Every structure is written in structure tokens, then in C-alpha cells.
Amino acid sequence: MYKVYLKPNKEESLKRFHPWVFSGAIAHFDGEPEEGEVVEIYTSKKEFIAKGHFQIGSIAVRVLTFRQEEEINADFWKRKLSIAYDMRRSIGIAGNPTNNTYRLVHGEGDNLPGLVIDIYARTAVMQAHSAGMHLDRMAIADALTEVMGSQIDNIYYKSETTLPFKADLYPENGFLKGGSTDNVAMEYGLKFHIDWLKGQKTGFFVDQRENRSLLERYAKGRSVLNMFCYTGGFSVYAMRGDAKLVHSVDSSAKSIDLTNKNIEPNFPGDTRHAAYAEDAFKYLDRMGDQYDLIVLDPPAFAKHRDALRNALQGYRKLNVKAFEKIKPGGILFTFSCSQAVSKENFRTAVFTAAAMSGRSVRILHQLTQPADHPVSIYHPEGEYLKGLVLYVE
């Protein structure tokens, strides 16, 4: 196993159990490791600190263990997945008869940086965000089969677009186990079609589950607008919450089809819902003030810090339009899923938008990701989803 030696005093974050080693902290290697190989990390004084997957790029090593004696083998993967599953079962997420849609592995939050596994009924969708996790995919799939047992029949691997561009790897999406295309899953008693083959992320935004449930509580008797609706998750919950009407908007015709496909089995023949394939900003420009509950859940405006300024301008512009159009006494659910946008950045953008609109606005809830998307206390960067529920006078 190759060794990585750090520059003097560059081990402090690792001693606080942060799971990343940046390339600028590395003094030298004792050889030439291949991308994805497990390497050992040492201080400049040749003291062992951790082991992890090596990769060319800003984040050079993603830590898998801080224990020198721990081998990265089949037992390791089984143990880590068992810990992840047991945590979710203990808090009522896994094994819930009304909800078979959840995140089993959330990267650094489960001490498995670079790995995401979502469960949709009897299918697990696995996604690698590092070369090491890609190379270990079969060992992980075998461990997943052992841990989940008869609870899953299929493991679908979806990493064609998630590996860093510098990695000299060409992953192909496809089934590692099974091959069923039965893609209906349940979330709190509601049925959803999950497009893991061609959909965004792993096919569904699992991270908004609790926020969708919260919206249901506010929907009764309200006219609801769900912008950037994608699968229509918020729309389905608004319908069950007895909204007066629900309009879903997305620039993608495919998303509109998927939204309608999710509305119909839950509310067959219900005429309260309509969906429109249209640019969000254009729709907000032309709409009247007929809505008293608006959801803004756009895709990530900033995937990297160099796009932060433009992203914040985008959030301001979007929220200004919503503040200007929402009815008095209306409720705005507004989100950012950009990791590069901090809670403070996002809140400032929304505050500025409120001030520009001249409306009186109060914060009812400050939202984040659910418990199956845990944040390691040693890796605060893992808290990526920000949301506010606002009362607009």
C-alpha cells in the first residue's frame, strides 16, 4: 500500500477527523498510486493518521478509516453498511411500512465519502462520486446484498455523470444485481414513479421528504404553485393536504410527464391539478397573484464556489418575483441545494429579495435535509440543503 506524506502541520484537520486531504497539504508520495487505490496517510514525522481512496484533484484523499489495523475489505464494507442501515432502522426510517424510499448511505455523513445509496422499494440505486468507490462497486454491492437480504432484489449502478472529469474512468450505468424495471415506491403512503434510469440524481429527491410532509400541513384551502416541480413531489403532498388547486411548473416536458404520472395514481381524475412546461422566470413574470402558497426548489445554481456570485443573484431574482406575486397572508417555501451556498449566503439573498419587494415577511421554519442524510459533526460541509418557510403579509 502506497504512503502519502503531509507537509508539516497539515495534519490538524485530520486529527479532528475531517475526512478530506487536499492536494496542497501533501508533501510527497512513496510511489505512484493509481486513482482509486487505498493509500495510507502519514504526518511529516511519519506518524500514521488514516487510510483512504486516492484521487487526482483538489481533494486528493477521501478518508475511509482512522484505524491503521482496519483493512478495506469485504468485512469493512459489510460493517459500514450495517451501521448505516441500523441507524436508519433505529430512528424509524428503514423498515417503515408507509415509507420504502430513503437514503441508506450519505457519503461523508456515513463515513463513506464518495458513496451514495438510495433505496426505492426493492431497488437500491448506487452512485459513486470518487474513483475509489467506483473501483470498489462490486464489493460494495456484495456487502449491500448481505446487509439488506431479502429486502432488495435489484442494485442499479448510476455513475456515468458523477465521477470527476479528471478521473480516467468510463463507468457505465446498469444493474449490478437483478434487472427489474418496477419503479413504483412509497413515501408516507403516497406512490411515486422513480426514474432511476434517466432521472436526475438517483431518480428522486429523497432529501425533501420531511419538507414535503410539512407543506402538506399548510396546503389546506390554499392555491399552490410548485416551481421546478421535477417529479411533482410537493404537488402530490399539497393535493393530499386538501389544497384548493395545485399548479406544477418545470421547463422540462419530461418532468411534467413524470409529475402527472405521480399525481394520477394518488388522485385519479382529480381536476385540482394542472402542470405547465415553461421557464420558471417567464411563468412568474406572466402569472397574476392567484397563489397563496409557492414552492421554489430550483436545481443547484452553484455547483462550485466560482459560480457563487451569479447563484446568489439568481436566488434574489427568483425570490423577488415570488414575493411580488404571492397573495397577502401567503406562505413561501424557498430552498437552495447548492453546497457552495452557505446558510448565511442563502438567507441574505432571501432577505434582500424581501426588502426589494417591500413586503413584510416572517420566518416560520428553517429547514434542512432529513435524518437519512446525516451530517458528520467533523464535516460541516455535508449540510447542503437550506430552506425557509416564510409568512408574507
What are these regions (language model features)?
Residues T231-A243:
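Conserved SAM-binding loop of SAM-dependent methyltransferases across substrates and taxa
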Residues M1-I119:
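Non-catalytic accessory regions of SAM-dependent methyltransferases
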Residues G221-Y230:
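Conserved class I S-adenosyl-L-methionine
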Residues V105-D118, H134-F205, S213:
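Non-catalytic substrate-recognition/targeting regions of SAM-dependent transferases
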Residues L245-D250:
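Conserved SAM-binding motif I beta-strand of class I
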Residues Y291-K321:
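Mobile active-site "lid"/loop adjacent to the S-adenosyl-L-methionine
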